[in-house]
Amino acid sequence: MKVNDRVTVKTDGGPRREGVVLEVEQFSEGVMYLVSLEDYPAGVWFFNEIDSHDGTFVEPLHK
């Protein structure tokens, strides 16, 4: 995923939320995405772990 991609994010206990990627940072353990959400237009950071499906919080939006 890259900047300006539409995505969904997993949050605590609720349904997935739609947002837009503002920034991407690569790390050895995974990738951090700054995602703009309706309630947080400036963005919230989410981390996707490389080797863990449970650690995947940001996914491409499929419509």
Curated annotation (Swiss-Prot):
InterPro entries: Dextransucrase_DSRB (IPR019717). Belongs to the DsrB family. HAMAP family: DsrB (MF_01549). This is Protein DsrB.
